[in-house]
Amino acid sequence: MIDPAIESHYGIGYERSRLFPGGRPTLEFVRSMELLDRLLPAPPARVLDAGGGPGTYAAPLARRGYQVHLVDPVGLHVEQARQAGSDPAAAFTAALGDARELSEPAESQDVVLLFGPLYHLTGAADRQRALAEARRVLRPGGRVLAMAVCRFASLLDGLYQGWLDDPAFRPLVDQDLIDGQHRNPDPVGRPEFFTTAYFHTPDGLLAEAEQAGFGGVCVYGVEGPGWPLRREWSDPHRREQILFAARAAETQPSLIGFSHHLIAAGVKA
């Protein structure tokens, strides 16, 4: 069901706290929630969070009044998600599942989130299966929001972190730029280099969503050009500047690729 390298990477358990270092939300989380708040229909819409991890987005959406069900192929994530979903103020359900073969009935969901499957499914055919399944379970007019990692994420991260001379990292960057196939040979020992994944170009993500039959597809840059400014993010004034830049750049074709993550939003006709 899941690549062993991916399972071992997430088996470390760090994903639950990754977007909240020191208890504070990161730019990635803040901007992703901002886009969800803007693009989702009003609660109590039904949301299927396919590949939803430990409930990072399911919990706040449930707290807003959405009816959320999460599926994920990693057992630890499902266990953590069930713990998060047991809070009466943010209740949601969670189960083991694969975005390529959803158990939900056809036309049963208002929203499908794919915040993980499109970058961990490294083959184009598998990504199309996940998108087709999302389309199948959506009602007419329902929305898909699919997250991707940008093709240039390792290049920019390596530049700002000083990793481009690291012999364990540079080959990853070179391969990412060739075909987007990201392979970290040590996903447990060097989790900061991520794990097995496919990194999209903005145009490639758009094309895949349209190929799956979604209409009105728009690709958004999530973090914008300011995501390397991690220390500045803790300063409220600088934080607002970073968010301003992200919002200004989110759909500009020449700037989308500076974001670490992309979100494609589309509608089932």
Task: Please provide the spans of the model-predicted regions.
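A short acidic, Gly/Pro-enriched loop at the edge of an enzyme's catalytic core
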Residues: R100-V112
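Class I SAM-dependent methyltransferase SAM/SAH-binding core
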Residues: T56-E101
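Conserved class I S-adenosyl-L-methionine
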Residues: M1-G51, T56, P60, Q80, R143-D179
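C-terminal lobe and adjacent flexible extensions of AdoMet/dcAdoMet transferase-like proteins
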Residues: E208, A212-A269
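A short glycine-rich, Lys/Arg-flanked "PGG" loop and its adjoining helix->strand segment in the class I
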Residues: Q128-P140
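Acceptor-substrate binding/catalytic loop of class I
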Residues: L121, G189-D203
